[in-house]
Amino acid sequence: MTNYAIILAAGKGTRMTSDLPKVLHKVSGLTMLEHVFRSVKAINPEKAVTVIGHKSEMVRAVLADQSAFVHQTEQLGTGHAVMMAETQLEGLEGHTLVIAGDTPLITGESLKSLIDFHVNHKNVATILTATAPDPFGYGRIVRNKDGEVIKIVEQKDANEYEQQLKEINTGTYVFDNKRLFEALKCITTNNAQGEYYLTDVVAIFRANKEKVGAYILRDFNESLGVNDRVALATAETVMRQRITQKHMVNGVTFHNPETVYIESDVTIAPDVLIEGNVTLKGRTHIGSGTVLTNGTYIVDSEIGDNCVVTNSMIESSVLAAGVTVGPYAHLRPGTTLDREVHIGNFVEVKGSHIGEKTKAGHLTYIGNAQVGSSVNVGAGTITVNYDGQNKYETVVGDHAFIGSNSTLIAPLEIGDNALTAAGSTISKTVPADSIVIGRSRQVTKEGYAKRLAHHPSRSK
């Protein structure tokens, strides 16, 4: 059995009120077009053809070499859009799925079931339908007394009886490929919209006594077509529920799943605990046994097993097992933390590698640094890595002790087991096993304060 797919993605999406093409609006981190294409891949199409039009280069870039593309210069209806794919598919034997690029909730499982139904019933056309609580605005499925599909009638063309029907057309179909393009040559624009309706091919097939069927979706939500921001928010809500439920089934605990945002490509191992208001984006992975507390935000990062991240932001970073972060820490892109590192409150790390069991507990900035293992970084330590034009590296050896309020001016190397005195400004290499003091000697002038204006004795 050879399958093909046509994805309709040419429309502007006027009701979205956006410069961005409709199919490029995102749901749970992926564009709607990407969601649709991933589901389409479940039927293993021999060729996928995407119909593009408005801002076509932007749309093309999303799928790149995964699809063939045809251009619809004028948007003259769904039938016209499918006609554009004729140059790619005409005359080929097989079954062709036609689906809109603004239906992000459709699942690959449903599309596989649709194809199987179509083949098993030897249909020339099969319509994916759903039972709508409120069918207004949808094309209705009209059946005869034997349950066979007679036609699809659009809302503006439906009579009073047809408007009462609950079974609606989702806009997704499977056709015998050859017959599809033969029938498209016979449709006209004689309707209320003055467009080429793809649905008119159903009447053509029926007139030829060819078999047309309908496969009803189990979940009406899958049929949602996104035409405005309200529908986009609905799709986001449904997708978020699917994602959190999938992770719960796989052994993840959520304290308040309704407040958690997890994107589609995030992976989470079993026995992870996620509190409320956590955001996980991009290609993030969370290792087994890790705890993410309220307010944590992680994007494109790998978090190892048995870590604890407390109300912190992590971007494009890698954390090994047993790392603790936060509260209120910020790991910026290029950060790597080895096993059992502790990054405490109000610590920022960027573009740095920190060795195992090193601790930076408070109020510290580590940028463009290589820090060894079992290092203590005292409160208030700052790596001075930028001179206004270039970034420079700081290297700290194993078991070094960086005293509180140290200023490390890069480029700089501090050797193994070295110690910097609190309050020091260090700008030259510190050899291993050395103590360095880089501050002014304390001077105390007894009784001198009485001569200053702030002293209580001066106010008399």
UniProtKB/Swiss-Prot annotation:
Binding residues for acetyl-CoA, per the UniProt record? Answer: A379, N385, Y386, S404, A422, R439
Name the InterPro entries on file. Bifunctional_GlmU, GlmU-like, GlmU_C_LbH, Hexapep, NTP_transferase_dom, Nucleotide-diphossugar_trans, Trimer_LpxA-like_sf
Q: What ranges does the record give for the region Linker, renumbered to this chain?
A: 230-250
What positions does the entry give for UDP-N-acetyl-alpha-D-glucosamine binding? 8-11, 22, 72, 77-78, 139, 154, 169, 227, 332, 350, 365, 376
What top-level class of enzyme does the UniProt entry assign?
transferase
Which keywords appear in this protein's UniProt record, sorted alphabetically? Answer: Acyltransferase, Cell shape, Cell wall biogenesis/degradation, Cytoplasm, Magnesium, Metal-binding, Multifunctional enzyme, Nucleotidyltransferase, Peptidoglycan synthesis, Repeat, Transferase
Any GO BP = cell wall organization
| Known EC number | 2.7.7.23, 2.3.1.157
Q: Which family does it belong to?
A: In the N-terminal section; belongs to the N-acetylglucosamine-1-phosphate uridyltransferase family. In the C-terminal section; belongs to the transferase hexapeptide repeat family.
Q: What does this protein do?
A: Catalyzes the last two sequential reactions in the de novo biosynthetic pathway for UDP-N-acetylglucosamine (UDP-GlcNAc). The C-terminal domain catalyzes the transfer of acetyl group from acetyl coenzyme A to glucosamine-1-phosphate (GlcN-1-P) to produce N-acetylglucosamine-1-phosphate (GlcNAc-1-P), which is converted into UDP-GlcNAc by the transfer of uridine 5-monophosphate (from uridine 5-triphosphate), a reaction catalyzed by the N-terminal domain.
Name of this protein:
Bifunctional protein GlmU
The taxonomic lineage of its organism, from the top, reads: Bacteria, Bacillati, Bacillota, Bacilli, Lactobacillales
- The gene for this chain is glmU
